Amino acid sequence: GPGLTRELARWMVHGAADISMREFDPRRFGEYAKPEWQVIKAREDYCLRHEIPFPHFNRLAGRPIKPSPLYERLKAKGAVYEEVYGHERPRWFAREGLEQRDYYSFARPKWFDMVAIETKAVRESAGIMDISAFSKIEVRGPDAYAFLDRLTPNRLPQKPGGICLTHLLNRRGRIEAEVTIVRLSQDQFYLVCAAFFEQRLIDHLTFSTRGEKAEIINRSNEWAALTINGPNSRDILATCTDAALDNASFRWMSAQQITIAGHSMWAFRMSYAGELGWEIHGPREHMLAIYDALWVTGGKLGLKDYGSFTMNALRMEKGFKGAGELTNEVTLPEAGVMRFVKMDKDFFGKGQTQESLEKPLPWVCAY
């Protein structure tokens, strides 16, 4: 229609549209979208044309296409999966005799009580989730720090092992993506963001280079990740590693390469769920063994599997923003994320951010 054409023209001329074009961006599909897969999905779309568009409608044709190392194990434990950028990610887990399938409703679906069980576990004991679907990009080289520092409003970690949350902006000073950046070594950085931003993040970084000696490497299909959260998460993880996990030895928003169940992995002390927790990132081939090892003790300490529905509920209650709110329709002040912005440094989009601060905000994210 004419609205789409208008935004496409703005995108071509100004480098960014006025509204979010995620649902029209061809980069919402990855390399997995081969011709044979496209045929399967086209047939599915035709068959679903007159179906009721329930919230969280799950399209099942052509799956699984990018299962994680934990896929079969979690499926056997009741995981009901969703597809994000080709990846299979658990939504929730069927328990207490509930059939392992999708339930649709405009009111309260049957999975609501299952999510409540998962949420309670993360708050009161511990929960574990397969987060392998996240985009995982490495930037390394002698100019890696200067390159990323020029793009990011927040101050990058000054030493290896530091972590920061920051945002990438487009030419209009609006949010392109929220990114967690981990400094693995002096000239090596690891970026984590939402699954469907994978190619967009790579493009944003690639098109922003100015001849810097910085290599951009996609680790999304090579590495897997899981997160363990809750009051008992430290005790559970401690049984699988000799690393010290106390507050003094392993600070909040810090990263260490530690041995877990005999495998060298990166542990990040951070938690999107808002509780005490760690994310564990590393080679795909080790993740199942680590998951099983955590369950040896975790099963005795109230550990439960949880999915994206629980994660989303917990992060909203904590006040953490998500990709749904952080779009190219909002500036940093409008999104309410200025605590992650250092106006005393230079960054791409700083001028537009300053303008937004000086004017009455047309709207703000209310939580």
Q: What is the predicted function of each stretch?
A:
Residues 117-124, 169-178, 210-212, 259-267:
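Short amphipathic beta-strand starts and helix->beta connectors
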Residues 154-208:
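Well-ordered mid-protein domain cores that form the structural environment of catalytic cofactors
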